[in-house]
Amino acid sequence: MAKGEFIRTKPHVNVGTIGHVDHGKTTLTAALTYVAAAENPNVEVKDYGEIDKAPEERARGITINTAHVEYETAKRHYSHVDCPGHADYIKNMITGAAQMDGAILVVSAADGPMPQTREHILLARQVGVPYIVVFMNKVDMVDDPELLDLVEMEVRDLLNQYEFPGDEVPVIRGSALLALEQMHRNPKTRRGENEWVDKIWELLDAIDEYIPTPVRDVDKPFLMPVEDVFTITGRGTVATGRIERGKVKVGDEVEIVGLAPETRKTVVTGVEMHRKTLQEGIAGDNVGVLLRGVSREEVERGQVLAKPGSITPHTKFEASVYVLKKEEGGRHTGFFSGYRPQFYFRTTDVTGVVQLPPGVEMVMPGDNVTFTVELIKPVALEEGLRFAIREGGRTVGAGVVTKILE
């Protein structure tokens, strides 16, 4: 049941915690809600236990455990995701189930960067998480300040290795647990009253300042994946679908992109929603778009309508992929180069051939891998586009386009 209406007064930003197991991601997530709630009555506190038993979600046919919390600062409203397990992070980031405008990388000062620290930074780079802020946690467990400097240098180096600006990324040192314990003792602790709580404020300030407010979907170039096509006698051909981004109105020029050998231009002669005429369709709307001079045969499900020049059709790309385990309903066996499944982009399946990278003989269920795909038909592709890999209608993997080759 919804608790009151969501009033949009502040810009909205999606963030999440990433980092190695047991470095304190969930404790930090809980601390953020408590600290923000002390200064803002709209924020609901969430304790460690509530966040840790993250509910299951499904995204692109894959089950993922993700916890969502919300909090706000004086400047912005945040949605924050936290995942209990490492595999959940991989699945979450690859499916884009929880898109992040920026990530909070949690690193334990006692351990320094660990294998999953590296893996999550790499994933963030591949799936296009644009900004990272670092919270160096558990600093109360380290007596030597030089050791803290060393850990900070290591983290900055690691970020640089994966093309994040490691030298300018904010690194905040604190203890999520000590901050949370203080908030449990006194839930009204304000900024300036406790050194550990102040570290959480320092992190919130860094998120406010360093992670820019994203461009809203409605301000991006128009794109609508075509779901269905039909003819209105005497008026022409209508393509229906949900507008992914941008807006569209009568008189706009659009391109029909993908599946066909040629991209063709046409003009929008009508926009309708639930059989009513619409002045303008915007991102998120389910609409029918009437297209001038286009026959029923010239547009089909799986193509996209887009602002001219904003997206192009391609057949060959590189992708970062998560292959489902047998227990997740995936394949029971591995696959090799030459594997030919269906790639489900937006609204349609297209067959493609997989080429594994040099040195990788075989990919097993449960693996996270980067490989090249060549599709048998062109599809409107761009970096960051998510897809499912299917065999006979069941999902066996999920991926994201990391590089377009041709």
UniProtKB/Swiss-Prot annotation:
EC category: hydrolase
Keywords: Cytoplasm, Elongation factor, GTP-binding, Hydrolase, Magnesium, Metal-binding, Nucleotide-binding, Protein biosynthesis
Residues engaged in binding Mg(2+): 26
Domain tr-type G per the UniProt entry, residue ranges: 10-215
Residues bound to GTP: 19-26, 82-86, 137-140
EC number, as in UniProt: 3.6.5.3
GO cellular component: cytosol
Region (G3): 82-85
Region (G4): 137-140
GO molecular function terms noted in the UniProt entry: GTP binding; GTPase activity; translation elongation factor activity
Catalytic activity: GTP + H2O = GDP + phosphate + H(+)
Pfam families registered for this protein in UniProt: GTP_EFTU (PF00009), GTP_EFTU_D2 (PF03144), GTP_EFTU_D3 (PF03143)
Region of interest: G2: 61-65
Cellular location(s): Cytoplasm
InterPro entries on file: EF-Tu_GTP-bd (IPR041709), EF-Tu_GTPase (IPR050055), EFTu-like_2 (IPR004161), EFTU_2 (IPR033720), G_TR_CS (IPR031157), P-loop_NTPase (IPR027417), Small_GTP-bd (IPR005225), T_Tr_GTP-bd_dom (IPR000795)
Chain positions covered by the region annotation G1: 19-26
Region (G5): 175-177
NCBIfam families linked: EF-Tu, PRK00049.1, PRK12735.1, PRK12736.1, small_GTP
Matches recorded under PANTHER family: ELONGATION FACTOR TU, MITOCHONDRIAL, ELONGATION FACTOR TU-RELATED
Oligomeric form and interacting partners: Monomer.
Role summary: GTP hydrolase that promotes the GTP-dependent binding of aminoacyl-tRNA to the A-site of ribosomes during protein biosynthesis.
Family the entry assigns: Belongs to the TRAFAC class translation factor GTPase superfamily. Classic translation factor GTPase family. EF-Tu/EF-1A subfamily.
Protein name according to UniProt: Elongation factor Tu
Species of origin: Thermus thermophilus (strain ATCC BAA-163 / DSM 7039 / HB27)
